C-alpha cells in the first residue's frame, strides 16, 4: 500500500510549483514571510516621527516626538476542497488522472481565486489613490498611466518595487501605439503583469461550496482597468496551504484516491503606506 505521507511530500513541491506559475500576485510575496505560528493575528510595528525644527543656541535642539504603534493583521480566509478519483479511472489512465486533476485544480481554481481576492482587497483599501474612466484607446491608457506614475512619484513611492497589473486588452492598446516614446510610461514600473478581467474586480464574493464554488464578482463591484502596487505597501500571508492525499486502500468511504486541500491565508495593506496603491477602475 502506498504511503500517504510520502505521497503528500512528493506532491507538495509540484502543487507549489503549479500555484506559483499560475499565480499573478505571487510577485508581491515578501522574501521573508511573517510567521502566524500559534496564532491567527500578528502585529507589525509602525513608526512615526516628527520632522526637523530650528536649533536654538539658547535652548538647544527642537523637541520632537517618535511614536511606535502596532498594526494588527488577522487571517480571515479559510478555504478548502475535497476531490476524489476512482481507483479504476486512475489505473486506466496509467496513473495520470489523479495528478492531472490536482494540477487543474491549482491552475484553474486556486490561483485565480487567490489573485482575485488580493486584487479586491487592495482595491477596496481605504484612502488609496484612485481614478475611474472608460479607456477606449492607447492614448487614453497612456494618459491614465502617467497620472498614476506621477501620483506615486509625488508620494515618493519607490519606483523600483512598483508593479503594474493591467488587463490584456488595455496593455494591447498601449502596445499597438506607433511610437516607442508613447510607451515610456511603462518604464516607471518595475514590472508589468497582465491580468484577465475575470480576476480583476474591486470586490468579490467567496462562495461557501454549499450551492456554488469558488468566487464571483460582487454585486456592487467594478471592473479594474489597472492597479499599481508597491511591494512594500502590502503583506500577503499564507499560514497553511496543506494537501492531504489518501490512497484507495486508506479511503474509508469509497474505492478512490482522495485529495483534500486547505488554504488559510489573507492579504493586507499597511495603513501608513496606502500611497503605494493606485487603482484605476472602469465606469
Predicted regions and their residues:
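Sequence/fold signature of self-assembling virion shell proteins
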Residues: 2-51, 68-82, 93, 177-283
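Intrinsically disordered or highly flexible coil/loop and linker segments, enriched in small
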Residues: 24, 53, 115-119, 158-161, ...
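Structured, hydrophobic secondary-structure cores that serve as assembly/anchoring elements
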Residues: 41-43, 49, 62-63, 69-94, ...
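Short amphipathic helix-turn modules centered on a small-residue break
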Residues: 55-65
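Short, conserved acidic/polar surface loops in the N-terminal third of protein domains
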Residues: 55-57, 84-87, 94-96, 118
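Hydrophobic alpha-helical segments and helix pairs
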Residues: 93-147
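Extended, solvent-exposed, turn-rich assembly/linker loops in the middle of proteins
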Residues: 126-193
